[in-house]
Amino acid sequence: MQDERPVDQLTEAEAATELARLAEAIEAANTAYHTHDAPQISDADYDALKLRNRAIEEQFPELRRSDSPSDRVGGALAEGFAKVRHEVRMLSLENAFDLAEVEDWIERIRRYLGHVGDLLFTAEPKIDGLSLSLRYEKGRLVQAATRGDGETGENVTENARTIADLPTELDGAPDLLEVRGEVYMSHEDFAALNGRQEAAGQRLFANPRNAAAGSLRQLDPAVTASRPLRFFAYAWGAHSEPLAATQHEAIARLAALGFATNPLTRLCTGPEELLAQHAEIERQRAALGYDIDGVVYKVDDLALQRRLGFRASTPRWAIAHKFAAQLAWTQLEGIDIQVGRTGALSPVARLKPVTVGGVVVANATLHNEDYIAGRDSKGQEIRGGKDIRVGDWVQVYRAGDVIPKVADVDLDRRPEGAARYRFPETCPECGSEAIREPGDSVRRCTGGLICPAQQVERLKHFVSRAAFDIEGLGAKQVEALWRDGWIRQPADIFELPNRYREGIQRLENREGWGRKSAENLFAAIEARRRIALHRLIFALGIRHVGETTATLLATHYGSWAAFEAAMTRAEVGAGPEWQDLLSIDGVGAVLATSLVTAFHQEAERAAVDALAAHLTVEDAEVRAPVASPVAGKIVVFTGTLEKMSRAEAKARAEALGAKVSGSVSARTDVVVAGPGAGSKAKQAAALGIETIDEDGWLRLIGDA
């Protein structure tokens, strides 16, 4: 991104801080997009975050986090649907933004395969909708599931049956066949739907993608049936027999079975033909009648696809070549400051409504105070140093979804007297000092739990699906209960039944509640007094501690008593507890500091202790012993691995009973060093620890 310091100029400490920030931002974007069908940043901004994260990981492989966004697919599941575990994972795609990146992808494929001849590819439009997997047994549709987090989706079978161009029976199909594709809504149908919504006085949808996703995920199939959804098939999952030998032949087979496939799919050789097809599809984009945001390229030979395989979250044999963002000019009417769960002050532009790429937008992200001032977080100019002022005419862009980004300012149209924007140095919600920590690009409220905005956002996080997931207590209910003074901290939720059971009428008389729903809520709260350790750690809402990190911490410490005692004794920067914390692969100094600091802040600790008094915390699951050459050994991976991703290597080692550490110590048994290993390899040599390369590791575990 243009407002960021070049990766090759970052110090190791700056890179670690940046990776932590990116992990937090990408996780929030994933949840908004995949779980709530309500994106908070544009596709272009999201792609840029992922791209920068990948670039930093490549420059500093030893800093790669265990919860790296590079390994994540989709988001958490929504409430109300049964879970479906995908027999074959539904992965996301790597992105390319120009010809050079497409050529690099092709070259990586050639190197991986040792292939010097011509390669054939398919090119097809990337539909902007909701991914769906359809399972057919003996030719009958038996299950439909959303992508979810890639491993587990939502069962939307009855809703999917209402989609007109989705066959419920197949003639001549394999006994088992999972067909995958995209549910979408045409522009014409979207306009008609919003017209009906407006006439009925109901909420309008922001864009066709949100309308399609919201329609498919209705709890009442009759509502879905009333919505004009469509489906394009483009892939497959589990199958009892091959569909064909090539990608384009397999798509033709799906069409013969009765599925709608995209007519713009073409067979291409080399980057020049791919780029020509990309340009042709983009030329036709406005006339297609449905939203697309790029072109997907796939290796055509399915045998080669199988050889290429997958990284942690993307196939090696496919890539999405995205379109450039869409632009428009409008006037900035105001700047609001929102305060998030971790105290971040986020500026939001309030715009005179403008149509960008067919969608009316009125808000835009302004990132942080430096972005408004026309510089990046290191003081270097962006936009030629032009600052952003209320009243300015600004250029905004979007590339598929809601809140866009302010890209430029027209100084010639700046109103006389427009004043420089002064970013608040106190929290607009609680008045506490808002400070910027070294290396942080945002200003944060220091009020902690006395800040009402942080209170309510933390409570929302606490009841989220990956945390306590209390049925009947979602974000809206939490906000209402907080607003009326019923809850202020997580412990208050568990006091609700005792405090209000006698006066249950108080709750049932609230808007949206009845006696049954109130009784169900109290029962759900009681059920959550027993909680898994990793869920509790995640629910605390400590900065930088995501789901994956919470699981790592739970696995490492085993019990709440051990975890709580270690955090109590730990001191930032020194001591055995600190070193033990840093030994966890994926836990760096930034995350560890955040964790230890939280347990040493008086208000934070009081809230944690009050909560723990209500709970029975289940110990982390202990894996059964595994017989392998590395079982029980502590392994450190450093440098670049060429035959598998770091995440794949870590998963394989742990499956064989090894413990993967993020740092080298006297307790380390084996260091696996790839190119660019750096200080960890030197430290291992100094300690006399066995060091092997990737091939040696594969021989050791029997995968050579």
Curated annotation (Swiss-Prot):
Residues 625-704 form the BRCT domain. GO terms for molecular function: DNA ligase (NAD+) activity; metal ion binding. GO terms for cellular component: cytosol. Keywords: DNA damage, DNA repair, DNA replication, Ligase, Magnesium, Manganese, Metal-binding, NAD, Zinc. It catalyses: NAD(+) + (deoxyribonucleotide)n-3'-hydroxyl + 5'-phospho-(deoxyribonucleotide)m = (deoxyribonucleotide)n+m + AMP + beta-nicotinamide D-nucleotide. Its EC number is 6.5.1.2. It is an enzyme of class 6 (ligase). GO terms for biological process: DNA repair; DNA replication. NAD(+) binds at D43, A44, D45, Y46, D47, S92, L93, E124, R147, E182, K298, K322. Pfam families: BRCT (PF00533), DNA_ligase_aden (PF01653), DNA_ligase_OB (PF03120), DNA_ligase_ZBD (PF03119), HHH_2 (PF12826). InterPro entries: BRCT_dom, BRCT_dom_sf, DisA/LigA_HHH, DNA_ligase, DNA_ligase_AS, DNA_ligase_CS, DNAligase_adenylation, DNAligase_N. Zn(2+) binds at C427, C430, C445, C451. Its cofactor is Mg(2+); Mn(2+). DNA ligase that catalyzes the formation of phosphodiester linkages between 5'-phosphoryl and 3'-hydroxyl groups in double-stranded DNA using NAD as a coenzyme and as the energy source for the reaction. It is essential for DNA replication and repair of damaged DNA. PANTHER family: CHROMOSOME TRANSMISSION FIDELITY FACTOR 18, DNA LIGASE. Belongs to the NAD-dependent DNA ligase family. LigA subfamily. This is DNA ligase. It comes from Cereibacter sphaeroides (strain ATCC 17029 / ATH 2.4.9) (Rhodobacter sphaeroides).
